[in-house]
């Protein structure tokens, strides 16, 4: 776990001098370098957000024709956009990441991508590639993708992350943009349903991040990142966390009444929502780090299963 940090032991003078000469000529192989450049994009995070976009394309495709090429092009665009945003964010956060046990082994602080500016250039390259693909779709899709990247990198990473306790609430708006993009890529417009679904993702983000911040509370405090559970007394922070989970579940049910859904989505929203509420109430009544970890580990499957149920519901019509 993150609270078990291992130290780095200095070598003896003789061994250190000998190993210095030896390691000075060692170069990482292509495989290790490629792995580092993939890792800096946070592929698991990219996969989840891209999945929300793919699900929205399937949902929109129930009433609008979707070619295979459009689907692939849009999916590739959102993958590159999210990957680019994460790579730039890792460059911005390199000093903070180097001080946290959870993040110090990331490619930039660990030196696997060096100099650090290479992560920045890699992210910017992915930005440009994603915007080029989105431009071939339609203007609304391009704007939502551009807005999502700017929101994450500029509003969250550069501006709010180290300045405001509400960093993830405001900056989290960018997390809903892939869902909006998926809908816009197919329809060329934005309507109430995709806005509500994007809002659901935005409400999911505080639950996801704050539960992690509770578990790593001491580390966030040490690097002076004002996450709400770090700045506020824990009970007050849990009040806000529980509120966002309640709103998230309410929105998931509201989406059923706004869209043309069947019982698959409704049943999934109710069951997964009940589980999210139960875990949140559990930690609210008895605040413990391990319960925060359980809530964090549940949050990603919650979102993935909910969006999967949207696609299954459409396929079964």
Swiss-Prot record:
Keywords of this entry: Cell membrane, Heme biosynthesis, Membrane, Transferase, Transmembrane, Transmembrane helix
Enzyme Commission no:
2.5.1.141
Going by the entry's taxonomy, the superkingdom of the source organism is recorded as Bacteria
One family name in Pfam for this protein: UbiA
Instruction: State the compartments where it is located.
Output: Cell membrane
Give GO terms: molecular function aspect only. Answer: protoheme IX farnesyltransferase activity
Share an example GO biological-process annotation for this protein.
heme O biosynthetic process
Taken from the UniProt record, the cysteine pairs bridged by disulfide bonds within this chain are none
Q: In which pathway does it act?
A: Porphyrin-containing compound metabolism; heme O biosynthesis; heme O from protoheme: step 1/1
Q: What class of enzyme is it?
A: transferase
Q: Which family does it belong to?
A: Belongs to the UbiA prenyltransferase family. Protoheme IX farnesyltransferase subfamily.
Q: What other remark does the UniProt record contain for this protein?
A: Carbon 2 of the heme B porphyrin ring is defined according to the Fischer nomenclature.
The role this protein plays is: Converts heme B (protoheme IX) to heme O by substitution of the vinyl group on carbon 2 of heme B porphyrin ring with a hydroxyethyl farnesyl side group.
Assembly, in brief, is: Interacts with CtaA.
- In its UniProt entry, what is this protein called? Protoheme IX farnesyltransferase
What organism does this protein naturally occur in? Desulforudis audaxviator (strain MP104C)
């Amino acid at each position: 776990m993150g609270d078990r940090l291992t130290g780095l032991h200095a070598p003896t003078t003789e061994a250190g001098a000998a190993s210095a000469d030896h390691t000075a000529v060692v170069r990482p192989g292509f495989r290790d370098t490629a792995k580092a450049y993939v890792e800096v994009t946070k592929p698991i995070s990219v996969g989840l957000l891209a999945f929300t976009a793919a699900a929205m394309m399937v949902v929109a495709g129930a009433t609008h024709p979707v070619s295979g090429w459009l689907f692939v092009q849009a999916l590739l665009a959102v993958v590159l956009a999210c990957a680019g945003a994460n790579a730039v964010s890792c460059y911005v956060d390199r000093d903070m990441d180097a001080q946290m046990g959870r993040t110090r082994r990331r490619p930039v602080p660990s030196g696997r991508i060096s100099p650090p500016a290479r992560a920045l250039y890699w992210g910017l390259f992915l930005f440009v590639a994603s915007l080029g693909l989105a431009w071939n779709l339609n203007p609304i899709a391009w704007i939502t993708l551009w807005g999502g990247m700017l929101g994450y990198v500029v509003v969250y990473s550069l501006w709010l992350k180290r300045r405001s306790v509400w960093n993830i609430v405001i900056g989290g708006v960018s997390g809903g943009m892939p869902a909006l993009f998926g809908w816009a890529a197919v329809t060329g417009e934005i309507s109430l349903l995709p806005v509500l679904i994007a809002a659901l993702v935005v409400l999911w983000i505080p639950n996801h991040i704050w539960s992690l911040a509770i578990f790593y509370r001491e580390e966030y405090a040490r690097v002076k990142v004002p996450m709400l559970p770090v700045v506020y007394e824990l009970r007050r922070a849990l009040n806000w966390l529980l509120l966002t989970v309640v709103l998230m579940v309410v929105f998931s049910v509201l989406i059923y009444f706004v869209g043309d859904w069947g019982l698959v989505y409704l049943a999934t929203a109710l069951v997964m929502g009940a589980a999210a509420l139960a875990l949140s109430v559990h930690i609210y009544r008895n605040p413990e780090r391990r319960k925060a970890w359980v809530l964090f580990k549940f949050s990603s499957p919650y979102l993935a299963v909910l969006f999967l149920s949207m696609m299954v519901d459409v396929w079964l019509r």
